[in-house]
């Protein structure tokens, strides 16, 4: 069993339907790993019927019977399955989305009374054990909570759920205790490896959910430092020097972009989990946050600050990001095209989020298959190569990369709109959308290959191994 600290350290952003520009709900996350290369695939898991199987985690041995019936769903499993599937994120055929997980850490006080369970539910299993079996975001919270109650939790995890109406965020922080909060429809939320949920209203089950006995657990063990509030973050979370350099600055930067009128400090321990943006948010806004690295501040590792400033805070977009995704459930479109999974391999700063319709029965070979050795015919490796080339001459290549991503974003919107319009005339929507996904993958792969060729050619002129020469020599 790999130590958890080597597994995942992510940034998550959620958007309610009335907070978005088009009525969509959105959940999103950068899946960050300990190593810079941790290959991922994009896959469609088929629906199952009359199954009689037992699930056994390759990561920690969690064992539980599987339901006989399960929905089709998309996922982004690891290339190396030796530590389990780690499917991470996806949308099922009922247009319910899940992203798991945001690693979170409880304090020693609460863990002393409810320690983590070594072979309990962990990140590797969450998507596989919940997404195929839920009809709504709220059902997802309940099913995940029921599994934790029965089998315990091996780790601290934050999980996002969404359907066309609701967005929920659940934090499992000890062996058996958790809470969940519905993101208000007109708000967004950002989480960054730190317990985020704040005050819980136990008289409002429509907007909050929690593990059985959590109030008694807290009061019985004298865990609440406040006499006036029940603040989950302050009871169960951490507030350390590491948090102020690794975690809170990411929330600060996202809120700085989405609410520039509000002045806050990057090391503040009181940044709110939920905010209402100063404008309606688009999928491009979510992409900007996921791609960000303290842009236009002295803390930008690619900027002009001092070396100390550029290394003070951990950025949102990293070379260690393996999979950056946005699960968008759209309203005001036919059910067949509501689910769009924007998937980005490679470093998010330099690479595009590619939109795939999730009502499909297969993914493109360049995303589904993953050769052991690098090849530019594979989407993961292609985008990793692009990121490395762009960063190698960032000043010279930055604008070309920005133009490439902008052109693809424009193309994506046009393609999605055309597909929305065409879907009503399709006898087999799943087959049609599967074909559209192949076209989308091909377009993005070709555009990326073209840019890569352009930058390699231009880069030869930037080599330090050169000299002013006579053109005839």
Curated annotation (Swiss-Prot):
Keyword annotations from UniProtKB, A to Z: Dipeptidase, Hydrolase, Protease
GO molecular function: cysteine-type exopeptidase activity; dipeptidase activity
Coiled-coil region(s): none
Catalytic residues identified in the record: 10
InterPro entries listed in its UniProt record: C69_dipept_A-like, Peptidase_C69
Example GO BP: proteolysis
Catalytic activity: an L-aminoacyl-L-amino acid + H2O = 2 an L-alpha-amino acid
KW Protease (keyword) present: yes
Record EC number: 3.4.13.19
PANTHER family assigned: LD30995P, SECERNIN
Family classification: Belongs to the peptidase C69 family.
Protein name per Swiss-Prot or TrEMBL: Probable dipeptidase
Native source organism of the sequence: Latilactobacillus sakei (Lactobacillus sakei)
